[in-house]
């Protein structure tokens, strides 16, 4: 293990993880696999008694704390970007919750999956800004889609993917089978199989407000501006009363 290898590992981590600590595929399974890869790298460093063995400790903790938030009240994960619940039990069991001395407070999300949680409710909101980078090659056409669970039951969901390989996950990526908003049965994102988006909203904007009674998520995108002269906006008003 030399400085070049360590530098490359840092480069990969910096380019694949967003500032909140989420893998830029915005797929919980891929996120979990990346955490496991970092843990394996640390184990290799420790085996060779490398002084850089703890270099990814902060990132592992950051990513694990985000993963800890990605569960609905029924124990399932949100089905964004081809996720599925085949490995949910393994993902949940991999979390060592004893590492968290206090609950992490997440700063405002400006790009990614925004979420709200209380004792009985969980809300996820897709405000990911698609791009042409290869890291986006698994993103679905689900801008402004949402998931909601409450009192142990999933209420709104996305299509996800029934398996990890084959044509079905790819088909579902570019279908409109997401809880998003469309005009005249047209999709805002053009996706080619096994590639990043060809056409996508150039601007996805997210705003979050809080008051004593409500948490407000508001997202918008310009994917229909050129063809329909419309800005699409979705506003979620969440009652913060735990019993509602």
Predicted regions and their residues:
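Short, charged, low-hydrophobicity "junction" segments
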Residues: 11, 95-101, 191-194
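Non-catalytic C-terminal accessory modules of carbohydrate-active enzymes
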Residues: 104-244
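Active-site lining segments of carbohydrate-active enzymes
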Residues: 1-27
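Carbohydrate-active enzyme catalytic cores, enriched for enzymes
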Residues: 18-159, 211
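Residue-level preference for alpha-helix termini and adjacent loops
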Residues: 16, 22, 76-79, 170, ...
């Amino acid at each position: 293990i030399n400085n070049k290898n360590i530098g490359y590992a840092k480069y990969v981590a910096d380019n694949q993880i967003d500032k909140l600590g989420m893998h830029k595929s915005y797929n919980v399974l891929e996120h979990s696999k990346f955490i496991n890869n970092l843990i394996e790298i640390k184990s290799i460093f420790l085996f060779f008694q490398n002084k850089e063995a703890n270099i990814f400790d902060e990132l592992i903790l950051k990513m694990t704390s985000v993963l800890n938030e990605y569960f609905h009240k029924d124990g399932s994960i949100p089905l964004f970007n081809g996720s599925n619940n085949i490995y949910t039990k393994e993902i949940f069991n991999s979390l060592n919750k004893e590492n968290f001395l206090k609950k992490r407070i997440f700063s405002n999300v400006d790009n990614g999956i925004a979420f709200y949680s209380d004792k009985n409710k969980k809300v996820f909101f897709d405000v990911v800004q698609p791009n042409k980078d290869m890291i986006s090659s698994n993103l679905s056409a689900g801008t402004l889609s949402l998931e909601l669970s409450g009192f142990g039951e999933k209420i709104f969901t996305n299509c996800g993917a029934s398996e990890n390989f084959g044509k079905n996950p790819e088909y579902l990526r570019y279908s409109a089978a997401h809880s998003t908003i469309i005009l005249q049965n047209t999709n805002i994102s053009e996706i080619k199989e096994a590639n990043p988006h060809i056409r996508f909203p150039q601007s996805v904007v997210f705003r979050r407000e809080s008051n004593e009674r409500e948490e407000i998520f508001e997202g918008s995108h310009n994917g229909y501006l050129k063809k329909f002269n419309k800005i699409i906006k979705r506003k979620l008003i969440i009652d913060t009363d735990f019993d509602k």
